[in-house]
């Protein structure tokens, strides 16, 4: 699992946001097969 900042984590299958870690930031995460790409967040 890789941490991208602002509460965004990705592994080989999906990305997700830990809202506790994000602390109110809004992140757009696009999951792709074989990985994910974190979008630009707005805090």
From Swiss-Prot:
The keyword Lyase does not apply. Bacteriocin with antibacterial activity against many strains of L.monocytogenes, L.seeligeri, L.welshimeri, L.grayi, L.murayi, L.ivanovii, L.innocus, C.divergens and C.piscocola. No antibacterial activity was detected against L.lactis, P.acidilactici, P.pentosaceus, L.salivarius, L.delbruekii, L.acidophilus, L.plantarum, L.casei, L.rhamnosus, S.thermophilus, P.freudenreichii, B.breve and E.coli. Has potential for use as a biopreservative for inhibiting L.monocytogenes in seafood products that do not usually undergo an adequate heat treatment. Displays a high degree of stability when incubated at temperatures of up to 121 degrees Celsius for 60 minutes. It is found in: Secreted. InterPro entries: Bacteriocin_IIa, Bacteriocin_IIa_CS, Bacteriocin_IIa_dom_sf. GO terms for biological process: defense response to Gram-positive bacterium; killing of cells of another organism. Keywords: Antibiotic, Antimicrobial, Bacteriocin, Secreted. It comes from the Bacteria. Belongs to the bacteriocin class IIA/YGNGV family. GO terms for cellular component: extracellular region. This is Bacteriocin divergicin M35. The keyword Secreted applies.
């Amino acid at each position: 699992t890789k941490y991208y900042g602002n509460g965004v984590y990705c592994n080989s299958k999906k990305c997700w946001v830990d809202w506790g870690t994000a602390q109110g930031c809004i992140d757009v995460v696009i999951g792709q097969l074989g990985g994910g790409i974190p979008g630009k967040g707005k805090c």
